[in-house]
Amino acid sequence: MSTLKIGICGWGNVATGLYKIAKKNIESIKKQGNLDIEIVVIGARRDNPNCKPENVIIERDIFNVVNHDIDVMVELIGGVDVAKDLILKALKKKKHVVTANKAVIYNHGDEIFACAKENGVKVLFESSVCAGTPIIKLLTEELSANKISKISGMLNGTSNFILSNMEDGAEFQSTLELAQKEGYAEPDPSFDIEGMDAAHKIGILSSLALG
């Protein structure tokens, strides 16, 4: 049985959620996929009280994560410039990269994918658009031989929640506060309500579908 060694960069809610799910499902993955998963190192500038990893190296300098013996780096720090530099460093060290960062793919996708190709590794970004819905795989594999002329859908959950409630008579501000309370919206919801989140997703999907 082969072992997939993973390094995680970032230690917020998404990263800790990934860690917990991976730990919980390790035996199932072994049985179904004939693959052992080992989280070797976590790049975390500070501790997260919601999750205390066990038997894992902690790097306070996230750029040191790719210096460890890992096969895959999972980038979950968010932002653009630092994330781009981190991803490029990992690719140049022949590490595969998984990211949920739509902003860095939207802004620097061409450079990132070119670097991955040059170094013979992959960049997987399914979760950057529509969370767990496999729209990226659908466009790049199942529908790759089809001519796509249009994509439509609900691309931003926060905006959809707010607009649906306003359609029923609710006020914008109170609905936004409810979305934040329920965890749909971030404490700073500007990317959602100003349309940047949806714009990044549209850019990624249109690039994949239309070239």
Predicted features, each with a name:
Residues K84-K93, K102-T140:
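Rossmann-fold NAD(P)-binding glycine/threonine-rich loop
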Residues C9, E75-I77, A100, N107, ...:
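Structural motif
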